UniProtKB/Swiss-Prot annotation:
It is a multi-pass membrane protein. It is found in: Mitochondrion inner membrane. It comes from Tetraodon nigroviridis. InterPro entries: CcO_II, CcO_II-like_C, CcO_II_C, Copper_CuA, Cupredoxin, Cyt_c_oxidase_su2, Cyt_c_oxidase_su2_TM_dom, Cyt_c_oxidase_su2_TM_sf. Cu cation A2 binds at residues 196, 198, 200, 204. Component of the cytochrome c oxidase (complex IV, CIV), a multisubunit enzyme composed of 14 subunits. The complex is composed of a catalytic core of 3 subunits MT-CO1, MT-CO2 and MT-CO3, encoded in the mitochondrial DNA, and 11 supernumerary subunits COX4I, COX5A, COX5B, COX6A, COX6B, COX6C, COX7A, COX7B, COX7C, COX8 and NDUFA4, which are encoded in the nuclear genome. Its cofactor is Cu cation. It holds the Pfam family COX2. It catalyses: 4 Fe(II)-[cytochrome c] + O2 + 8 H(+)(in) = 4 Fe(III)-[cytochrome c] + 2 H2O + 4 H(+)(out). Residues 1-14, 88-230 are mitochondrial intermembrane. GO terms for cellular component: mitochondrial inner membrane; respiratory chain complex IV. GO terms for molecular function: copper ion binding; cytochrome-c oxidase activity. One of its GO terms (biological process) is ATP synthesis coupled electron transport. This is Cytochrome c oxidase subunit 2.
Length: 230
């Protein structure tokens, strides 16, 4: 999760987020090389005493500055398109969770079970226990199994919301009257935090998201207990 004075991304917990981190490094290297080249040209132009005001055009230069940007854009676009298709692909999900945004909390429904649903509210600061995080903890976590394809259906009851978990590389808009979907695989056990990422009113900052990834047998025990309490 995020920590104070952090300059980079959160640690990846899904294959999609790992791909996004690699793409970020790839694009950043291209931007760094372009910036270095431009600064060198500016410095060389400002410091040289050689001038030629009689050159009105140059076919060679025009070809170069047309082809080079096209090649650079292709180098950025191809891996970007690959990740976009990867993020949109949903193959045989083992579990489907319907997520609804409300002012100002989230509700979760496990559609593969008859009656497994709950609301998830932020824990107030005065009720936190040592080790819990302010404005990030909830009274009920979204519990899912590790290494299993998970499909999340996202919508909203009232206004626009956005279900986002940075460590998983997910940000899906919750639109009233529309059902969006995304899929992911959590590659390691852990607790992953997110927040509503669409301004939705006075308490927009107080509707956190907590995803807990556990081994399959632990998930089965948790779901059995939740069904017994329902």
């Amino acid at each position: 999760m995020a920590h104070p004075s952090q300059l980079g991304f959160q640690d990846a917990a899904s294959p999609v987020m790992e791909e996004l981190l690699h793409f970020h490094d790839h694009a950043l290297m291209i931007v760094f090389l372009i910036s270095t080249l431009v600064l060198y040209i500016i410095a060389a132009t400002a410091s040289t005493k050689l001038t030629d005001k009689y050159i009105l055009d140059s076919q060679e230069i025009e070809v170069i500055w047309t082809i080079m940007p096209a090649v650079i854009l292709i180098l950025i676009a191809l891996p970007s398109l690959r990740i976009l298709y990867l993020m949109d692909e949903i193959n045989d999900p083992h579990l489907t969770v319907k997520t609804m945004g409300h002012q100002w909390y989230w509700s979760y429904e496990y559609t593969d079970y008859d009656d497994l649903s709950f609301d998830s509210y932020m824990i107030p600061t005065q009720d936190l226990t040592p080790g819990q995080f302010r404005l990030l903890e909830t009274d009920h976590r979204m519990v899912i199994p590790v290494d299993s394809p998970i499909r999340v259906l996202v919508s909203a009851e009232d206004v626009l919301h956005s279900w986002a978990v940075p460590s998983l590389g997910i940000k899906m808009d919750a639109v009233p009257g529309r059902l969006n979907q995304t899929a992911f695989i959590v590659s390691r056990p852990g607790v992953f935090y997110g927040q509503c990422s669409e301004i939705c009113g006075a308490n927009h900052s107080f509707m956190p998201i907590v995803v807990e990834a556990v081994p399959l047998e632990h998930f089965e025990n948790w779901s059995s207990l939740m069904l017994e309490d329902a």
